[in-house]
Amino acid sequence: MIRVAINGYGRIGRSILRALYESAKRDRIQIVAINELAKPEAMLHLTQYDTTHGRFHTQVKLDNQHMIIGDDAIKLLHEPNPANLPWKELDIDIVYEATGVINDRQECEAHLKAGAKQVLISHPSSNDVDATIVYGVNQDLLRAEHTVVSNASCTTNCIVPVIDVLDRHFEVKSGAITTIHSAMNDQQVIDAYHDDLRRTRAAGQSIIPVDTKLARGIERILPHMKNKFEAISVRVPTINVTAIDLSVTLNKRVDIELVNRVLKQATEGSFSGVVGFTNEPLVSCDFNHDPRSSIVDGTQTRVSDGHLVKLLLWCDNEWGFANRMLDTSLEMIKAKRSS
């Protein structure tokens, strides 16, 4: 059993907790504490009720600065400085760093100084972390001495396994990506001030282009893809589930049937449970609460001139990513204990 703490109980933090309680990993992972500046009553309410993922299936209550879920008592903390958190006292193996604002090694080391053994960041990080992992592709890079690890981003986890399969079978020459991402909490409900002028506009009324570093994220996981990809991203007025429009030029000649067959075989083999494949006529809400990192929509595969391939990928940008946080943390402990 590994003892974990969640720092930051927002969309991803709560999804991690819910994903754990809906999975078979509860016999291996125990959430010991949650650090969040919000009031306990609000934390309880947002655990019980969720607009996107529905009601929590287990009874939850507060008792003496603990959140009680079934027979589990999770300590609630409200400390703004990670260095002051009682991780040593609580014997924390891994901190899930889910605030969204702590993303470099120096900031994460505050958790280590407080007594945590390792930190897993729930978003892209600076280059000074020990490793950036996309589960299913490069978790074998984890080493016992790694203390600060990034789980990359939901979109990187969605697209990299598919690029990896295409490259191994057909040799990817170059690619272009459009991420069609649900609205996020860094946007405005109605027009209001933001450093990004496009994000001053109401999230529910427009398709809003935003900056993305997805192409650089691909390079970090697949270094041989350096300078081969470019990406743009738009936010759309939905609350969850993201689509990715992926176009790649391949060195080998292909057709639609071959591309779909290879991708489907990968989902039944090495990427089982991580990448899915569908030929059903589905829409974005059909992938809500899907635990996989990526689902290839085979009905939308297109091939031009035998070498240019266009794919449509789906992912639940909250739930799929939260499940990968659990998977990566187990791999971190496995690497640490195998030394």
Swiss-Prot record:
Localization terms from the record: Cytoplasm
Major location (coarse): cytoplasm
Molecular function (Gene Ontology), one example: NAD binding
SUPFAM superfamilies: Glyceraldehyde-3-phosphate dehydrogenase-like, C-terminal domain, NAD(P)-binding Rossmann-fold domains
Reactions catalysed: D-erythrose 4-phosphate + NAD(+) + H2O = 4-phospho-D-erythronate + NADH + 2 H(+)
Binding site for NAD(+): R11, I12, N317
Active site: C154
Keyword vocabulary terms for this entry: Cytoplasm, NAD, Oxidoreductase, Pyridoxine biosynthesis
UniProt-listed Enzyme Commission number(s): 1.2.1.72
Residues at the site labelled Activates thiol group during catalysis: H181
Pathway: Cofactor biosynthesis; pyridoxine 5'-phosphate biosynthesis; pyridoxine 5'-phosphate from D-erythrose 4-phosphate: step 1/5
Binding site for substrate: S153, C154, T155, R199, T212, K213, R235
Record note on quaternary structure: Homotetramer.
Family assignment from sequence similarity: Belongs to the glyceraldehyde-3-phosphate dehydrogenase family. Epd subfamily.
NCBIfam families: E4PD_g-proteo (TIGR01532), GAPDH-I (TIGR01534), PRK13535.1 (NF010058)
Protein's job: Catalyzes the NAD-dependent conversion of D-erythrose 4-phosphate to 4-phosphoerythronate.
Entry protein name: D-erythrose-4-phosphate dehydrogenase
Organism field: Shewanella halifaxensis (strain HAW-EB4)
Gene: epd
